[in-house]
């Protein structure tokens, strides 16, 4: 019997990286998984793998930069399954823009995708969870939500905001809904590769106890903990999964 048997879990940004690994793990643990992303081919591939391994999943094509994102994901989920038990706000973007040159649009794009879309979707699912008397929301922040990294001014700002949002939501939604966050360090993902990969993050890697990049599966295992009764006395927390940065 899986830890998430019969539960419905929305995982945004789950066509690659940490979200995809979490979708696979949640499905193995019995969840009905709602995969979201912008690319239908990649989304279908994730759903196909889940089904091939005996799991259940659907995908929703939705762009977290669009104001219709939350409503689209919520409506499609309710249409398919009629409820929501777990939401993992994982969709995000990483801009390289620096303080001196970033434009208003670049800055606001990061804020909207990384924070606002999570808030809007959480607002949609919260009443469903409250009516059931239980629910879990997991916000993906970042290690840079604790300390800045040079050159990522919008990303750093958005992830600090995600830390604050997680704490605020936990206060307002307790005791019915558990709200916690994950602060990944440098994780081996397509997003990290898009901004230069290991070379760009080598200074951070050198400051970790483990001296390596993390794997998406290592984020997924923490997400599973936060999505189940294993974390029944954990609320409003931001768990750093960073290999031991600056310990």
In which residue ranges do the predicted regions lie?
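Substrate-binding pocket helix/loop in short-chain dehydrogenase/reductase
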Residues: 98-99, 103-111, 192, 200-204
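Residue(s) in the substrate-gating loop at a strand-loop-helix junction
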Residues: 142
